[in-house]
Amino acid sequence: MALEALKLISRFLPVAYNEPNDISARAGMLVGSCLAGVSFLKGLGLVHSISHMIGAEYNTHHGLTNAIVLPVVLRFNLEGMDSQTATIAQNMHLEELSAAKLISEIEKLMGRTDIPDNLGEIGVPLDCAHRIAKKAMVDSATSTNPKKVSLMQMEDLVKTSIIGKRTT
C-alpha cells in the first residue's frame, strides 16, 4: 500500500499543486493520501518522531514539518539499504536507483511545491535541538524506524533539519 501511495503521490502532487482545478490529479492525490494513511499502521519512524515534537512545541503544520524533515532522515536511514532504495526509486519511476538520486528527486519535488529548505525558515530555533531530540527518542514512532538511532544521531538529525539546505 505504501508503495502504491508513493507512485500516486509522486505522479499527481506536482500536477495538483500547479493545476489545482485538475480533478484527475486531485483524485490521484486523494487515493494516494488515503493509502499512505492506512500504511501508517505499519509504523512511522523518525520523520514523525521529530515532527511530533517540533509541532508540539512550535505549532508547526505536521505535513509541512514532515516534508522538511524527510530528506534529512532519508539520508540517515537509506545508507546501506540499497534494495529498499531501489524499490522506492522504481515506484517513483526513476531511472537511477541510488539513494542520492532518490533524495535529490524528493528535494526537487519539494522545491517545485514551495516547501522551505529547513525548519528554521518556519520559526524553529537551533537551540531547541537537544531538547527536541530527547523527546523524539521516546516518541512511539521512533521504535518503528528501520534503523536504530542514538541520542547524538537524533540531535544531529534535528539540527540538520533546522539549519540544513537542500542539495538540489
Q: What is the predicted role of each segment?
A:
Residues L3-P14, L30-C34, V47, S51, ...:
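Predominant activation on well-ordered alpha-helical scaffold segments within soluble catalytic domains
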Residues C34-N66, D139-T144:
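Glycine-rich phosphate/pyrophosphate-binding beta-alpha loops
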